[in-house]
Amino acid sequence: MELRRAWFFSLFMIIGLPYAAGATIVDDATLADEAEGDNWLAYGRTYAETRFSPLDQINEDSVNRLGVGWYLDLPTDRSLIGTPLVVDGILYFTGSFSVTRAVDARTGKILWEYDPKSIEHAGDRLRIMWDSSRGLAYWKGKVIIATIDGRLVAIDAKTGKRVWETMTVDPRRAFYITGAPKVFRGKVIIGNGGTEQEAARGYVTAYDAETGKQAWRFWIVPGNPADGFENEAMAMAAKTWTGEWWKHGGGGNAWNGITYDPEFKQVLVGTGNGSPWNRKIRSPGGGDNLFLCSIVALDADTGEYKWHYQTVPGETWDYNSNMDIVLADLKYGGQTIKALMHAPKNGFFYVINRANGELLSAEKIGKVTWASHVDLKSGRPVEIAGSRYEDGEELVWPSPYGVHNWHAMSYNPNTGLVYIPTIEMPALFKDTGIDLKSWSSPHFYVGTGVEFGRADTPADYGTAKLLAWDPIKQQKVWQHDLPPQWNPGTLTTAGNLVFQGRADGEFVAYNAESGERLWAVKLGSGISAPPVTYAIDGKQYISLLVGWGGAGLISGTLAAQHGWKYGVHPRRLFTFILDGKLAIPPSPPPAFAEPIDVPDFEIDSALAEHGLDVYAESCFLCHGGGAVSGGYATDLRESPIALSRDAFREVVVDGSKLAKGMPRFRQFADREIDGLLHYIRREARKAVVGN
């Protein structure tokens, strides 16, 4: 009798659980397996980062039957930009402030939730960071997250309990993490952000995936020569810098775009822009400034330098190369090349031989006026005179948003096409009001060495497209106009489909070969995350996080025109299946700010200008350029708190809303508070009664 009870209990546990425990061991072999499509094991699905799934149950013929299988409300979340993982029927994702959840991928039931308490750990760094994360990693039964405050945390995938934790940054510095960690060969690697808020010297670090112990670190730019260089690569790089660059950090932070290449046992690191942006300040005598805006290949076991390719020598526009690096076998000149594909901010699409870093081709995928072309013999861009704002200012395409930002592109080996969300908008690069010799690096506020974040961006200033690109011919095959300007990454499948969410809240499927629009649904909020697909018991699912977020929201009216007002529209995780019957849950219609003018408030123009300076350094990253919120935080022009000096001080200086993610600015004196209030009232009045 006891044996029978034990047998029935064991059977119940196996059947009742949403997955068979331990069925898939996620390691190098499974992460490199392109044929297995039931799981989504890594940020880009596999090591190749193609975001291509071999699943084809949902295809060009059946996609019109797609419907909602389940959805999960996420009322405590704000920005949802991440890629979920799916392992044996369990979906894992990170939400706001790095809160991580495991969900039954069949039903949407939450199995566990892990809160790393990022707000508490962040301290003053909360002033300079966003709440969102692009994803997480999975390795041998552990979910590994990178918290926004700079920690790596390994979580038991079954229980949701912490296994180990390690701090990857100096918490006294203005560093944070929004990128997804990557795992390979028993290690987990992560970089960080903070180039605009600190005298930042970028680096990537690999840790033991079982213990969290540091394995190796690679610095992206050289430090002070007087301290000696860490390796020969840094000594080589230092020859490309001038002046006392180390006092400004140099930059190069790798906040996204790290790919493991198993065929060459190397890690490919896409590096960031300069700290500060303006090369006239950080390297006044010129120079290429290695390894800014580069792809750097490192030995996966030791972290030693192997080769590099620099996309923007002497970077001065925030044209970083932190975008995803996709691996593929491509035919060039009758030969099959182990290639990488990369579309950084600068507007060119690169195909590079990943065995040695040799440039194979590079062509423009959007409007570019800083360079005419890339010379294939030298591998260098041919710059257009004046683009470095040598005379103090210049209108240049693209803007710091780039032609392509971090939103993931996908590659379909069946069509041979890459699907890229692109942006077309310029920026006025200007440093006429800056003393280039006395400029000092920021510390917990924004400082780029150019005038930035001081104005609203009009609704018609930027456009966006979904571009299908042939990487061999280096030409457009098809494209679709998208709502401006912040649209998420793509997914492509063996069903001859491309899926993409949109800034206006639509989720759309296209024919991957022809670009024909086949299916769409409106989900009630702006979409900033890419979809994933997986299969359970022979049924294909597609899941997507919906929650407007990311740096594009700082663009004021350009982002606000969609009406995704802060705190109004619900955040959700949607999952679609063939013949899904659930109705899309209701969501409020688009809502727009209603600025409040106080007619008897006498605006002091000098105070308001000082307030603009403070706002551009400390507030616009969340509340939007020109005091126009793009939806990430409250629009201060309509906030009742900004009508009361005492209430405003209580929030801004005393930190009364710290628990909700509003940082504390204890350093603000009366002049800063009054300046901000006068600036907000000025911008509100402009909106109500005109300029």
How should each PLM-predicted stretch be described?
Residues I190-G202, T242, V269-N289, E424-A459, ...:
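Short, conserved, GDST-rich strand-edge loop motifs in beta-rich repeat architectures
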Residues I25-V68, N224-A235, E383-I384, A455-D456, ...:
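Blade/loop signatures of beta-propeller domains
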Residues L72-T83, E113-A137, E165-A180, W219-G257, ...:
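Extracytoplasmic beta-rich repeat domains
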Residues I603-G625, R649-D654:
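Sequence/structural segment immediately N-terminal to covalent heme-attachment motifs in c-type
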